[in-house]
Each structure stands twice: as C-alpha cells, then as structure tokens.
UniProtKB/Swiss-Prot annotation:
The protein's role, per its UniProt record: Catalyzes the NADPH-dependent reduction of a wide variety of carbonyl-containing compounds to their corresponding alcohols. Displays enzymatic activity towards endogenous metabolites such as aromatic and aliphatic aldehydes, ketones, monosaccharides and bile acids. Acts as an aldehyde-detoxification enzyme. Also acts as an inhibitor of protein S-nitrosylation by mediating degradation of S-nitroso-coenzyme A (S-nitroso-CoA), a cofactor required to S-nitrosylate proteins. Also acts as a S-nitroso-glutathione reductase by catalyzing the NADPH-dependent reduction of S-nitrosoglutathione.
Main location: cytoplasm
Annotated gene: akr1a1b
Pfam families assigned: Aldo_ket_red (PF00248)
A Gene Ontology term for the protein's cellular component: apical plasma membrane
GO annotation, biological process: aldehyde catabolic process; cellular detoxification of aldehyde; glucose homeostasis; regulation of gluconeogenesis
This enzyme's EC code(s): 1.1.1.2, 1.6.-.-
Cellular localization per UniProt: Cytoplasm, Cytosol; Apical cell membrane
Keyword Plastid: no
Site (Lowers pKa of active site Tyr): 79
Protein name: Aldo-keto reductase family 1 member A1-B
Reactions it catalyzes: a primary alcohol + NADP(+) = an aldehyde + NADPH + H(+); S-nitroso-CoA + NADPH + H(+) = sulfinamide-CoA + NADP(+); S-nitrosoglutathione + NADPH + H(+) = S-(hydroxysulfenamide)glutathione + NADP(+)
C-alpha cells in the first residue's frame, strides 16, 4: 500500500502527519524534530494553536540543503483563522504564518472553519456576556482570496476544514481553483462515511483530525465513550500485536484518509507511524467502521447560565446542523 494520497493537483500528500493542536510551546519544537527523525514527512499546523514560531525553529534546524531533509520532501499544512476571513486579511495572515514557520511556501492552506469571527487581532472576540462576536463574510469571497495565493506561488494547494457537504458544493460552484482537501474530525465513533464518499466523488482527499478521539481536550464530558478502550479495537490490537491507536490509524490510512494524530511523546510519535507493515482484512475494516455512533468530540462550547452549549451553533454557516 502507498503511504500517501494523491491530490487533484498531482501532488503526493503523506497519509500520516503530525498534528500540533494542543502541543504547547516548549514541547512542540522537540515533537516536530522527533517526528521528522522518525520518518514523518507531513506536519499539520495552524496559527490558532499559538505554536507556529516554535515549529518554524524545528524546521529551520532540520530542513535545508545541508540538513539532511529537503524542504520539498516535507508536506506542511496551515490554516486561515476565523478572524481573517475578510479577503483583505487572507494574504497578510498567510504571510505571518510563513514568517513564523520560516518557510517560503505552504503545501496546503485551509480555511479553518466556514464561519467568520469579527475582524481584528483578538482570536476570540467576545461580547460582555462571553458570547462571540461574529462576522457574516461569505466564505466564497474568502475562497477567491485563497485562490490568489496559489497564483502567487505562496501555497501549492488550498482546501477546507470543518465544512459540511453542502458548503463544499457551495465552494465548488464558484471555484476557479478547486479545494483539494477537506480536514474534519474523524475516528471510528465518527466514521464520516457519507462525507468521505461526497469528497471522493468531487476529487477531494479527506484528512482526519482527532483520529484517536482527542483524549486530552479541555471540555471532556464525564459520560463520553473512550475510543481507545473500545473492545473491538482491543481485540484487533491483540491479533496484530499492535496498540489500539495503531489499529485506528491503520483503519483510516487503509481507507485512504490522511491521518494527523497529535503527540508530544517520543515513543508515541514513533508508534503512530508504524502502521504500514500490516493490513486489516476487509471484514475487520467494516467492523471498525461499524463502531460509528455519530459521536463528535470536537464541538467548541461555552458556558451559558451554568450550562455547556455549542458556541457557534447559531451562526448561519455553522457546519454541524446538517446531516453531514
């Protein structure tokens, strides 16, 4: 099996990458260095993770003509944050990311969420009651500004994150440069079968974030299911002499889904890439997919009147009100 997906541009995108969300400064630089040393050639970043300058230091120390790893052999993704959807803000935001990452171009640039927050330099602009200040910028206008970055050679490909099927088609209806990738939450409890099929039919590759169920999130629910303790996955792990995490990553990559598990632990970073030396049988693949229960771990929430509620559900571009 190939260890890469092929984008509609013809460019290869490694099926396994290092996620960097929640990797705090002070630890993320070393994690990226360990990943590159372990054979990773795909790093997923975003300015909202507040660690791009440190990732840039890791790139500076490991990549270059005299460093052993060539820039063109590493696939680097970053994302446009919600406060930067205004067409005038798109290029400056990318240039800041490039400066922080110490790169001349990105392999992939994604619109992080379909909805916009109020313009400015406050990442989460809020009203006095704690609710967020939104903007109604149409993401199709944002997309047109993203397309210009390709023409300028600043990004090799552009794509979407957290968009639903209807929103993808909305972008495709106006795109002169098509999105190549959709990055969404996906794991056995949220298998995204319909959305994956929707993407395939339209030439998009899917990337799965929080592929292990994001066990280190801030807003965990006490009753939520724990993916890594799922008995069906434990049984497969035992059979193949692998960890539950490796079984889950293998399931994703075997169905052609790019997977970006986050870790700052050297042993886990190494373990997560050791998934290309075995193959799940087709009924085992189906067994894992059948664990789907529509469980979304990543729904940004806020507390209103003492209750935890979805933060952005009232926005007209909120993606999770549609079936997929």
């Amino acid at each position: 099996m190939n260890d890469f997906a092929v984008l509609s541009t013809g460019r290869k995108m490694p099926l396994l990458g290092l996620g960097t969300w929640k990797s705090e400064p002070g630890l993320v630089k070393q994690a990226v260095i360990w990943a590159l040393e372990s054979g990773y050639r795909h790093i997923d970043c975003a300015p909202i993770y507040a660690n791009e300058p440190e990732i840039g230091e890791a790139f500076q120390e490991t990549m270059g003509p005299d460093k052993g790893i060539r820039r063109e052999d590493v696939f680097v993704t970053s994302k446009l944050w919600n406060t930067k959807h205004h067409p005038d803000d798109v290029e400056p935001s990318l240039l800041k990311t490039l400066k922080d990452l110490k790169l001349e171009y990105l392999d992939l640039y994604l619109i992080h969420w379909p909805y916009a927050f109020q313009r400015g330099d406050t990442p989460f602009p809020r009203k006095e009651d704690g609710t967020l200040l939104y903007d109604d910028i149409d993401y199709k206008l944002t997309w047109a500004a993203m397309e210009k970055l390709v023409g300028k050679g600043l990004v090799r490909a552009i794509g979407l994150s957290n968009f639903n099927s209807r929103q993808i088609d909305d972008i495709l209806s106006v795109a002169s440069i098509k999105p190549t990738v959709l990055q969404v939450e996906s794991h056995p409890y949220l298998a995204q079968v319909e959305l994956l099929s929707h993407c395939r039919d339209r030439g998009l590759v899917m990337t799965a974030y929080s592929p292990l169920g994001s066990p280190d999130r801030a807003w965990k629910h006490p009753d939520e299911p724990v993916l890594l303790e799922e008995p069906a996955i434990a049984a497969l792990a035992k059979k193949y002499n692998k960890t539950p995490a490796q079984i889950i990553i293998r399931w994703q990559t075997q169905r052609g889904v790019v997977t970006i598990p986050k870790s700052i632990t050297q042993s886990r970073i190494k373990e997560n890439i050791q998934v290309f030396d075995f193959t799940l049988e087709s009924e085992e693949m189906s067994q894992v997919t059948a664990l789907h229960r529509g469980w979304r771990y990543i729904v940004p929430t806020i507390t209103v009147d003492g209750k935890s509620v979805p933060r952005d559900a009232g926005h007209p571009h909120y993606p999770f009100n549609d079936p997929y």
